[in-house]
A protein has these predicted regions:
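Transmembrane alpha-helical core residues of multi-pass small-molecule transporters
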Residues: 12, 407, 531, 582-586
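Residue-level signal for the membrane-embedded core of alpha-helical transmembrane segments
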Residues: 13, 397, 401, 471, ...
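Transmembrane alpha-helical segments that form the functional core of multipass membrane systems
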Residues: 365-438, 447, 453-457, 477, ...
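Conserved catalytic motifs of ABC-family nucleotide-binding domains
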Residues: 479-533
Length: 648
């Protein structure tokens, strides 16, 4: 055996011996670890057994349990006081106040309104089954809380009134009102008092209102230093109308800032929305399409943190609302005065509502009647006429028909002027065609425009004569578009096959849903679109001959727009679709009548006379400046054309 072989055998033997020693030690350590784990498990088991025996002994000893409960009770008393501890353990009661318009149910748990039922309005249901009254507060989610801090043993303790059961002093009646008083004792001789007042005497300003007064009695010495008292008001509203989509379009959280002439809101969208205001807020309202709940402060809220969350379609609910407000507080504060509105979004009612101080708080602006111009038309023209007709006519379908006729009569001078302008354009069409043939090139567009304007002037035609009258009447037409979907007067009013003019009329329920259209067929919407096709085709025939550029828009005017309206309006108010149907039929009748009685030859004769007069008429300074401007623009275009040609 050579030297290298001997060295290799020795090294291998040494490595094997070291490996055996190392693994033996690891095995020994592992066994020791297992013994340690087993010992710890046995110790834990014995401790748990001992603890269980101690618990059994404590349960077997009622004196020890009572002592523990007494000690816990004393800790609560030391922290909150005897009055609040007793209030938390008290059994809640239910109380009810009622007048001809509202039934209001209260609970002494937090001394809050739990349910409000409207006597005159019912929830949508199929014909013959509509008997469920509108409920504005959901008892499961209605919540009101006042939060403030007390001084207790050198500590500030937070008090949330919703956690405590108030003591009811009962309901008293007299002087045309009912008063419910509930109190929460905070300390001996110190308490918070809630007073709710519901009026029996009929008064448009108070029919749907409650006064809500908060009084702090003897609290000032034990109140901690704080600048505001917090208020939290939340609720979940029911779906009351036929269409979730249509109702949601007008359901939002609204609020008004002091001294403002308009109302703000969080938007009328699905999903969630929120807003935090560090400025004062006059009132906050949980608004639906036709009903609202509003919380109004006499001295304004110091701030407002508001939000809503849209519920799922088919859940039976619309939105969850939450509003956290603050009221300014000083040691001299003796309480606060509020008003609570629970009622319809009816202009005649809301316009009479005043705040706790008797001031106008613009509650009627809750109804989305449009911006300043459109809203003005609705408030001062549409609504007064509508209310006047209601006094003498029972059928709202007939009222809409008469209102449409009145609108057409009102705008007839503008319609006639627009038609006359179109007729004049039709008469001078040969001259216009000659100008188009004379100046076919793009660089001559300015010169063609000049001669076209001269032709209009000689013929006595205003370039805006056709569209300006239509623009003037747009605010009124848009006002009616905004009025019908939010008019509670149409709610529950049937007409022909429609059960409710405030909702869509379904003559056929589909077993499936068509995207952007829905799962039903609205007959008023369908008839509106059919008449729109007829009206658009008739209007196209009238304008295409006088305006060649309209020829390429036939598909859009005659077919595309009515098809789009069919999808848009299938879920809209049947009253609105009925109005557009009647409006288009009347417009076609008027246009056919004017077409029959307006003589093109007579118009041509008058235009020839105007041309003769224009020849001898001196040009005005404005016309001279306009012609000079046109010449300068034409020269600029020629220079640009030359520059482009030079670059090539």
């Amino acid at each position: 055996m050579d030297k290298k072989t001997i060295i290799g055998v020795v090294l291998m033997s040494a490595i094997f011996i070291v490996y055996m020693v190392f693994t033996s030690r690891q095995q020994t350590q592992y066994q020791e670890y297992l013994k340690q784990v087993q010992a710890e498990e046995q110790l834990l088991e014995s401790e748990q057994k001992a603890q269980a025996e101690q618990n059994n002994e404590a349960e077997a000893d009622p004196v020890s349990a009572e002592d523990a409960a007494a000690a816990a009770h004393q800790r609560q008393v030391d922290m909150f006081g005897e009055g609040l501890v007793a209030a938390k353990a008290r059994q809640a009661e239910q109380l009810t106040m009622q007048n001809d318009y509202l039934t209001v149910e209260f609970t002494t748990q937090g001394a809050m309104m739990q349910k409000v039922t409207l006597a005159e309005y019912t929830k949508f249901a199929p014909k013959g089954e509509r008997n469920q009254k509108i409920v504005l507060f959901d008892p499961e989610s209605a919540y009101f809380d006042m939060e403030f801090y007390l001084k207790r043993n050198l500590k500030n303790v937070k008090v949330n009134t919703s956690e405590y059961v108030f003591t009811s002093k009962g309901i008293t009646r007299g002087e045309g009102k009912q008063t419910l008083t509930m109190a929460l004792e905070v300390s001996e001789g110190a308490y918070v008092e809630y007073e709710y007042v519901l009026y029996d005497e009929k008064n448009p300003a108070r029919d749907y209102m409650l006064d809500f007064n908060v009084k702090f009695v003897g609290l000032s010495p034990i109140m901690a230093q704080q600048s505001t008292v917090g208020l939290t008001w939340s609720n979940r509203t029911y779906q009351n109308e036929r269409s979730f989509k249509a109702e949601n379009m007008y359901t939002t959280l609204s609020y008004r800032l002091p001294e403002e002439d308009d109302v703000e809101d969080l938007g009328m969208s699905e999903g969630e929305a929120s807003e935090q205001l560090q400025s004062e807020v006059n009132w906050v309202a949980f608004r639906q399409q036709f009903f609202s709940q509003a919380f109004i402060a006499a001295d304004n809220f110091a701030y407002g943190d508001m939000k809503f969350n849209t519920m799922e379609s088919g859940s039976g609910y619309m939105k969850e609302y939450s509003a956290r407000m603050g009221m300014n507080y000083t040691p001299q504060t003796e309480g606060y005065r509020f008003s609570i509105y629970c009622g319809p979004n009816k202009y005649a009612v809301l316009s009479n509502v005043v705040g706790p101080n008797g001031d106008d708080i613009l509650m009627e602006r809750l109804i989305p009647l449009g911006g300043w111009l459109v809203g003005w038309f609705n408030r001062w023209i549409v609504i007064p006429v509508f209310d006047f007709l209601r006094q003498y006519i029972a059928s709202f379908g007939i009222i809409i028909l008469i209102l449409t006729i009145l609108v057409k009569l009102l705008i007839f001078p503008l319609t006639y002027k627009s038609y006359l302008s179109t007729a004049k354009m039709r008469v001078i069409k040969p001259e216009m065609d000659a100008l188009n043939a004379k100046y076919p090139r793009q660089e001559d567009a300015m010169k063609k425009q000049q001669e076209m304007m001269a032709l209009y002037k000689k013929a006595g035609i205003s370039p805006m004569g056709g569209c300006l009258p239509m623009l003037i009447q747009l605010p009124l037409l848009w006002a009616l578009f905004r009025f019908f979907p939010v008019s509670i007067e149409l709610r529950e009013q049937p007409f022909l096959w429609a059960d409710d003019l405030s909702s869509y009329d379904s003559v056929l329920n589909l077993p499936f849903s068509i995207p952007f259209y829905g799962d039903h067929v609205s007959l008023f919407c369908l008839l509106m679109c059919v008449t729109m096709i007829g009206f658009s085709y008739f209007n196209y025939q009238q304008t295409s001959s006088s305006a060649p550029q309209m020829a390429g828009m036939k598909f859009m005017m005659v077919y595309m727009m009515p098809a789009m309206m069919l999808f848009w309006f299938n879920d809209y108010s049947s009253g609105l679709c009925y109005y557009y149907l009647v409006s288009q039929v009347l417009t076609m009748v008027i246009m056919m009548g004017m077409r029959r009685f307006v003589d093109d030859d007579k118009i041509r004769y008058i235009m020839e006379q105007n041309k003769a007069k224009q020849k001898n008429k001196k040009k005005s300074k404005f016309q001279l400046r306009y012609e000079e401007l046109m010449r300068q623009q034409e020269e600029m275009m020629r220079q640009q054309q030359k520059q482009k040609a030079g670059k090539r």
